[in-house]
């Protein structure tokens, strides 16, 4: 069993973040949620999109979506409009963060986790997974 050193991960995360290189993902997110009830927060290599109508639960389901350099934008175009229509909180790895995550020095436990979705309950989780299974 691998044990992830959280302090090392946080330090690596903050060292690699460059806001100038996250503009593609960020502008796409802004177009999708511009008039929705969301709050965007940048934290390290992530852009957190918090639904103001459905606050994050203290515990519950998480859905991770992986991506490569070849398909990340296509995945964004499919996934983001759907989860925004459900008013679900999620986070996306920024442009620079994506490159960092795919590097050989990044902790393997975190590699490729491009989008994390936080469903409100089991029913919503199943619905999202069903959509993703058909669409991706």
Where in the sequence are the language-model features?
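Phosphate/pyrophosphate-binding loops and the adjoining catalytic core of nucleotide-dependent enzymes
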Residues: 2-136
